């Protein structure tokens, strides 16, 4: 049976859609204490680091025509990769909660007299819409998604013009941020997509071109969203999405556009959670797990301060940075392209060393101007090659 090939444009649009996100704009606001110039440099440097790993993961999938989790099996074994499917499901649940919270926060603009007691009902209402979207088969409703994408793009373009035409003001911030930390936060966003990028590049007829286009599209758009958040925070002096949109004069129509886009983007991590858990437990159906993920997201968004998710981002970095380092060493240097073991103890052992190193350095407060991801990847990469050669 011949596999259907995906066009480069279609794949690029997937990553363009993924990057246009309230979560990325909010994360960009954290860079405001650095100022515009230093904040922008941190955004670009971080995305270059994370985007490079994004490219490597996508290219491996495109060359081998394997899905993301199938490529992970190359380094960690068929059953060993289940660990990363589980960790991926956990991070996707976290993103689902963050997106639901932000969507509800945007809806609150419509309420002229803000009331905290109403917020749980807003998260519930948005969650129900997302569940209906999943049950209707969100992967098939292309026209609605296309309209939402175009209108969201126009709204972000309008917001960018608003930010560019206004002067920066002093921002009241409770905490400062180091340059290295900012680079790390920028690098982690592309890393969070490593467990799914190959799912979209594996059917390409032009592996390098497709992966390069996907990487460029996502990283450039993500940089735009980060920069928009940074600029909006410097212009308004605020760091909450609802306040930024309100001060920018976003109308009811604009709010509805954001809600529609948030609904679509939130369905993606929820559905991917079902796919990840289905890889571990085939008896589990994807759609019911996706619905449960949204329900968990509603609860988390209503009860936890999910917008303070710096540690969540660092968790993603600590898991997926050493993972991709081992995979890059095996595939590009050691030329290991096939699954050889059920559980690859060497690969898992090296990954664990990288994971512990990341957490240890973070706990000690150590960081370079390039963050933690870059040095951890380099060390894990070298260690993987040495240990593989010794244990061969």
Which sequence ranges carry the predicted segments?
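Extracellular loop-to-transmembrane helix junctions
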Residues: 29-58, 80-82, 218-220, 375, ...
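Juxtamembrane transmembrane-helix boundary signature
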Residues: 44-76, 83-91, 388-391
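Hydrophobic transmembrane alpha-helices that form the core helical bundles
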Residues: 81-114, 263-279
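Membrane-interface loop-to-helix entry segments
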Residues: 121-163, 173-174, 214-218, 314-325, ...
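C-terminal membrane-solvent junction of multi-pass transporters and transport-like membrane proteins
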Residues: 174, 325-390
């Amino acid at each position: 049976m011949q596999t259907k090939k995906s066009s480069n444009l279609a794949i690029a649009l997937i990553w363009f859609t993924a990057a246009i996100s309230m979560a990325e704009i909010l994360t960009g606001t954290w860079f405001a204490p650095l100022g515009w110039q230093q904040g922008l440099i941190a955004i670009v440097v971080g995305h270059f680091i994370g985007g490079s790993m994004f490219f490597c993961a996508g290219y491996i999938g495109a060359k081998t025509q394997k899905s993301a989790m199938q490529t992970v099996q190359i380094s960690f074994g068929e059953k060993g990769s289940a660990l990363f499917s589980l960790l991926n499901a956990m991070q996707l649940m976290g993103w689902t909660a963050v997106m639901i919270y932000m969507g509800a926060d945007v809806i609150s603009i419509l309420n002229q007299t803000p009331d905290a007691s109403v917020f749980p009902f807003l998260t519930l209402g948005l969650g129900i819409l997302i569940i209906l979207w999943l049950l209707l088969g969100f992967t098939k409703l292309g026209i609605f998604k296309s309209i939402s994408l175009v209108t969201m793009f126009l709204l972000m373009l309008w917001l960018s013009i608003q930010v560019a035409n206004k002067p920066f003001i002093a921002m009241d911030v409770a905490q400062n941020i180091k340059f290295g930390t900012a680079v790390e936060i920028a690098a982690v966003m592309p890393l969070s997509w490593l467990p799914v990028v190959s799912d979209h590049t594996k059917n390409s007829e032009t592996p390098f071109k497709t992966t390069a286009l996907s990487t460029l599209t996502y990283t450039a758009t993500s940089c735009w969203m980060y920069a928009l958040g940074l600029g909006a925070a410097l212009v308004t002096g605020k760091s909450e999405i609802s306040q930024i949109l309100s001060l920018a004069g976003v109308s009811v129509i604009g709010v509805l556009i954001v809600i529609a886009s948030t609904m679509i983007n939130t369905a993606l991590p929820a559905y991917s959670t079902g796919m990840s858990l289905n890889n571990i437990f085939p008896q589990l159906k994807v759609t019911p797990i996706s619905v449960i993920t949204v329900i968990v997201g509603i609860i988390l968004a209503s009860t936890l301060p999910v917008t303070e998710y710096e540690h969540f981002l660092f968790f993603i970095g600590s898991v997926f940075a050493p993972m991709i380092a081992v995979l890059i060493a095996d595939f590009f240097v050691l030329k290991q392209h096939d699954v050889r073991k059920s559980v690859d103890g060497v690969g898992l052992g090296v990954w664990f060393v990288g994971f512990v190193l990341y957490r240890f350095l973070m706990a000690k407060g150590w960081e370079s101007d390039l963050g933690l991801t870059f040095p951890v990847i380099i060390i894990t990469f070298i260690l993987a090659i040495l240990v593989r050669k010794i244990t061969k």
